[in-house]
Amino acid sequence: MSSVVIYCRSGFENDAAAEITFHAAEQGFAGYVKAKPNTGYVIYECFDAQHGDEIIKKVDFKNMVFARQWFAGTLIENMPVEDRVGAVVEAAKDFTLCSELRVETPDTNEGKELLTFCKKISTPLKKALEKRNIVLREPKANRPVMHVLFLTNNTAYVGYSYSFNNSPFFMGILRLRMPSDAPSRSTLKLDEAFNVFIPEQQRESRVAAGMRSVDLGACPGGWTYQLVRRGMFVSAIDNGPMNDDLMQTGQVKHFRADGFKYRPEKRNITWLVCDMVEKPTKVTSLMIDWAVNAYAKELIFNLKLPMKKRFDSVYECLSMIRAELEKYGISYELQAKHLYHDREEVTVHLNVTKVPQSLYS
């Protein structure tokens, strides 16, 4: 497979293109990008036909900020309308046995118009693939996932991703329901972040009732809502007013203070969350200060992106975090993602696993 197909938010094609080019080159692969504005996907064409498969194995998908999903694939054009199933099966005849089939479209208005067609063709296509022993009847762990990305009703990229290095979600999107009692739609960003960044088997222990948390820039309480919902006690930091229902839970203490100046009196905070509108480097510096001083164990924060050079801006901030934490000998895990519920921003998760006591004692 010479092509790597990457799904992204419409309008972020240049950022996804810059990112795959960067990571492919870092692993020693060469190629070029094909991208059109507002299409919701980009194609990385490898100069070596075998390298598409190698890229989706060797580049860690968790390091891809702007990619919602990816797969190694090939383009099928002008499929006969009377036998599109046969055309897809023929293109996939040499695939390793896959655990499941995902028939998808780009997340654009044009793509959404194809979703009904995708659902309609999925059943006969899956049966045909099962018959040819290309896709299993029942999903099985640790097997590749087959993708068919329809661009039109007779044009599609057909390929596969590896279950250990992809997004588990259809179209790479985790869809969440807006709680009717949440103070703002921003609540979905933190809900998605917990689901994306924290492995399901660890969620109960790492995001647990009784934990102490801090929400910087909390007003009116969209992110605080998610912390309260999970049973945490929250210090909400904001000069603005908080939602009355949240305050009546008894789990929230409101501090009218500047989020950039506030620091906790004790180092007993498990979660720090922050969704303040400020320059990304300024927010990053604040988060580094909290991490280096062991004020919180895990941090989730948003970086508001500039109109241009969004890829450069994000990677500059991630490099700042790595450089500072490594300078002080701090052990950590770092991941960033342009989540489905994000807009002109990305969400970062920093898990501080060990801070030398000499830094803050």
Swiss-Prot record:
Record's keyword terms, sorted: Cytoplasm, Methyltransferase, rRNA processing, S-adenosyl-L-methionine, Transferase
Q: Which reaction does it catalyse?
A: cytidine(2498) in 23S rRNA + S-adenosyl-L-methionine = 2'-O-methylcytidine(2498) in 23S rRNA + S-adenosyl-L-homocysteine + H(+)
Glycosyltransferase as a keyword of this entry, yes or no, is: no
Subcellular localization(s) per the UniProt record: Cytoplasm
Query: Which domain of life, per UniProt?
Result: Bacteria
Its GO CC terms?
cytoplasm
Which terms does the UniProt entry file under GO BP?
Answer: methylation; rRNA processing
**Catalytic residues in the record:** K304
Q: Which Gene3D superfamilies match?
A: 3.30.2300.20, 3.30.70.2810, Vaccinia Virus protein VP39
Instruction: Name the Enzyme Commission number(s) assigned to this protein.
Output: 2.1.1.186
Query: Is Cytoplasm found in the keyword set?
Result: yes
Give me the residues that bind S-adenosyl-L-methionine, please: S186, C219, P220, G221, G222, D238, D258, D275
Q: Which residues form the signal peptide?
A: none
Extract the GO molecular function terms from the UniProt entry: S-adenosylmethionine-dependent methyltransferase activity
Give the residues annotated as coiled coil.
none
Which family, according to UniProt? Answer: Belongs to the class I-like SAM-binding methyltransferase superfamily. RNA methyltransferase RlmE family. RlmM subfamily.
Q: What does this chain do?
A: Catalyzes the 2'-O-methylation at nucleotide C2498 in 23S rRNA.
Assembly: Monomer.
PANTHER family xrefs: RIBOSOMAL RNA LARGE SUBUNIT METHYLTRANSFERASE M (PTHR37524), RIBOSOMAL RNA METHYLTRANSFERASE FTSJ DOMAIN-CONTAINING PROTEIN (PTHR37524:SF2)
Q: List the protein's name.
A: Ribosomal RNA large subunit methyltransferase M
State the organism's lineage: Bacteria, Pseudomonadati, Pseudomonadota, Gammaproteobacteria, Alteromonadales
As recorded in Swiss-Prot or TrEMBL, the protein's gene is named: rlmM
